């Protein structure tokens, strides 16, 4: 397989922890370059066992046709080393039990925080994972997560950049509990314009700026719990912001491949990808709802999430499907971890402006995003205190 050299910026860990500003970020990034060897062709997996070699243009053409895939060129081992607990053995609570505790926390969720964060996040020309803007936006996001932990006085919690060879790092925030059993809440931070990824604008307000700021707000409010702050929860909680989802779930594959190798005990993973668009549902005369994905997910976790929505959200759920490898929860599933995915609506009514210059804030509902934040916060708290085998 032939390869070609592509120059990409090197985003240092020191800068990652300190960067908060666009101009500062660019000044640092331009001082350092990293030579990365990019393959001429990529091995993708379109369904279990169905693989194909494609070039980069062919990858984007598949995405334009709404065909999803894993890019397994450098992640072929994902799912092959899983000798830990079978994901099917995880038993979830029969029902939510922390209604009284969560009631005051849910009132703390603020859609204005989500709007402010999303306005900045979408101001980057693109968050394409192989661009300087993608590195800068990741630096800004890492700064916001750091600030969230600091403002909460979360001295036991931590956040780190998970580096990748393409430049844009993933981000992992960890709130330790009494055990290493882990609950993961995820979203992807990158965006893409499929018509010319390296150059055209990709504000990515809904995909997946909405999920990014939704889980950030859930993290902020979760840290208002003294029990969580003091590490008194039964389980550890992690918040992930994945790089390069649009390239074939690259960032999440790298993370869950490392977790699989380390035999990490992940009890649940929820993905929040696209949480803000509701207009097409309303135009169809349907009630506002959230879409619970039912294919290629863990049935037990999905059933518990349905109960969470019923108890803690002000709108109902609908059952819907999104296909194979449709978001980062698929990487967790492939590694043997139980995962679930909740999207903004029935999949057929989801945002069609994604992957273009028109994926803008003006088309989103922050009231709807608040419902996703309620679900995320409630699930994280309920499972933080759940007792697993």
Swiss-Prot record:
Binding site for Zn(2+) 2: 207, 246, 355
Gene3D superfamilies: Zn peptidases
Glycosylation site residues: 99, 146, 156
Organism of this sequence: Pyrenophora tritici-repentis (strain Pt-1C-BFP)
Name by which UniProt lists this protein: Leucine aminopeptidase 1
SS bonds (residue pairs): 322-326
Family to which the UniProt record says this protein belongs: Belongs to the peptidase M28 family. M28E subfamily.
Quaternary structure annotation from Swiss-Prot or TrEMBL: Monomer.
GO MF term list: aminopeptidase activity; metal ion binding; metalloexopeptidase activity
Keywords noted in UniProt: Aminopeptidase, Disulfide bond, Glycoprotein, Hydrolase, Metal-binding, Protease, Secreted, Signal, Zinc, Zymogen
